Amino acid sequence: MGCTVSTQTIGDESDPFLQNKRANDVIEQSLQLEKQRDKNEIKLLLLGAGESGKSTVLKQLKLLHQGGFSHQERLQYAQVIWADAIQSMKILIIQARKLGIQLDCDDPINNKDLFACKRILLKAKALDYINASVAGGSDFLNDYVLKYSERYETRRRVQSTGRAKAAFDEDGNISNVKSDTDRDAETVTQNEDADRNNSSRINLQDICKDLNQEGDDQMFVRKTSREIQGQNRRNLIHEDIAKAIKQLWNNDKGIKQCFARSNEFQLEGSAAYYFDNIEKFASPNYVCTDEDILKGRIKTTGITETEFNIGSSKFKVLDAGGQRSERKKWIHCFEGITAVLFVLAMSEYDQMLFEDERVNRMHESIMLFDTLLNSKWFKDTPFILFLNKIDLFEEKVKSMPIRKYFPDYQGRVGDAEAGLKYFEKIFLSLNKTNKPIYVKRTCATDTQTMKFVLSAVTDLIIQQNLKKIGII
């Protein structure tokens, strides 16, 4: 009897049908476990137009739930901020001339010291004073050229999709096909830009003849990364440049006048912070603080994932680049989203896009939010709208009327609360679904305020997720 039982057992084990069933059971069990893990994972999508403050929100999440920033990140930001500080002051000098603003530093007789500071600054090439590999390697260099070379303005437009709704279509196909009209428009734009840029370059070369022997516009990037890395000469030291920037920022009235009109051209949003703290950034061995990193900006390219745990809940935050050329990648992370965090820069109602200076940033954000909110991809997905940079908004509305850019605004000039309610109403009115939209007012660089806001938001999202999976 024992042999018979043994033979039967061996026969069962070798039965192909039984083997397939057991294999299927293992696969099914694995899928169920994975499905359960997916249910427990809260997947957030962080979206918004370029320079809205998305990445700063993510930095705050890292500070709260990931233990902050690595030593390498702190060194990287120190390099990037130093380069941006030099270029930002150069931009103010050059833009002042384009805007017809008289600079004290242009007068070598009555303002000899400031004139000398200007010469020091415009002779300095920012890339000579940083370690490009620490700053981010080729990604940093490419972004640097696109940001600071006026010759690349046309290239930024070409890389742009040209319209907010061209990020993706409802069938899931990435919209990257240009019509004949698009091509004709680009050709005309390139010709117009070429004429205008050539004219500007000639004028700038004339202006810069007193700055160096070549008469080159120092804002234009003329070196390849290989040439930069191979260059050993250091005619100026960091302290010289820092002192020049500090003197120009504190003592040249024209620089401050130009800065007050920075909505008319592209300038780093934290330029004033860089200038106010320029001496510490001048140290080649400086290690950035949390505040420095929150103020600094490194362009988001592609899609980054950040994971952290809050209690028993696992969060995954997807941060996608906000500029138009990056949006075609968004569709790859639309599936399985628990909530969308949309970041809106309130203070940029009077500014133009970096990638297309013919388009108002707030108008772009409105169109983008409308497209995402009513997309089939997010039919039942709750949205959390961050009205960001409200500190800058509250200051700006005192001198820059909202009605100048939004004629239907009826609130009092300088009334920040009325302005916030006006824009909040615009965004909420776009909702053509029954999904909830939660609005939070934020200053993403204020750690204490963001700690409170993000704690409230994560608690809300956890509750929403528990409802979704049927636990409550």
From Swiss-Prot:
Activity regulation statement: Alternates between an inactive form bound to GDP and an active form bound to GTP. Activated by the G protein coupled receptors (GPCRs) STE2 and STE3, which serve as guanine nucleotide-exchange factors (GEFs), and inactivated by SST2, probably acting as a GTPase-activating protein (GAP).
CDD domains to which the protein is assigned, alphabetical: G-alpha (cd00066)
Lipid bilayer topology: Lipid-anchor
Domain G-alpha: residue ranges: 40-472
GO molecular function, one term: G-protein beta/gamma-subunit complex binding
Chain positions recorded as Mg(2+) binding sites: S55, T300
InterPro entries: Fungi_Gprotein_alpha, Gprotein_alpha_su, GproteinA_insert, P-loop_NTPase
Phenotype for E364K: Enhances the rate of GDP for GTP exchange and slows hydrolysis of GTP, resulting in a constitutively active form that down-regulates the pheromone response independently of the pheromone receptor
Effect of N388D: Forms a nondissociable complex with the pheromone receptor in response to receptor activation, resulting in reduced pheromone responsiveness
Main location class: membrane
Region (G4 motif): 384-391
One GO-annotated biological process of the protein: nuclear migration involved in conjugation with cellular fusion
Reported effect, A345T: Suppressor of a STE2-L236H mutant
Localization terms from the record: Cell membrane; Endosome membrane
Chain residue ranges for the region called G3 motif: 315-324
The record's account of how the chain is modified after translation: N-myristoylation by NMT1 is pheromone-stimulated and required for palmitoylation of Cys-3. This lipid modification anchors the protein to membranes. Depalmitoylated by YLR118C/APT1. Monoubiquitination targets the protein for degradation to the vacuole, and polyubiquitination tags the protein for degradation by the proteasome. This may be an additional signaling regulation mechanism.
Miscellaneous field: Present with 9920 molecules/cell in log phase SD medium.
Stated role: Alpha subunit of the heterotrimeric guanine nucleotide-binding protein (G protein) that mediates mating pheromone signal transduction. Binding of alpha-factor or a-factor to its cognate transmembrane receptor STE2 and STE3, respectively, allows the receptor to serve as a guanine nucleotide exchange factor (GEF) on GPA1. The exchange of GDP for GTP on the G protein alpha subunit alters its interaction with the G protein beta subunit STE4, leading to dissociation of the G protein beta-gamma dimer STE4-STE18.
Record note on quaternary structure: G proteins are composed of 3 units; alpha, beta and gamma. The alpha chain contains the guanine nucleotide binding site. In its GDP-bound form, binds to the G protein beta-gamma dimer STE4-STE18. Directly interacts with the beta subunit STE4. Probably forms preactivation complexes with unligated receptors STE2 and STE3. Interacts with FUS3. Pheromone-induced activation of GPA1 increases its association with FUS3. Interacts with SCP160. SCP160 binds specifically to the GTP-bound form of GPA1. Interacts with the phosphatidylinositol 3-kinase (PI3K) subunits VPS15 and VPS34 at the endosome.
Domain notes: Contains an 'insertion' sequence of 109 residues which is not present in other G-protein alpha chains.
Protein name: Guanine nucleotide-binding protein alpha-1 subunit
Organism: Saccharomyces cerevisiae (strain ATCC 204508 / S288c) (Baker's yeast)
Lineage: Eukaryota, Fungi, Dikarya, Ascomycota, Saccharomycotina
Protein encoded by which gene: GPA1
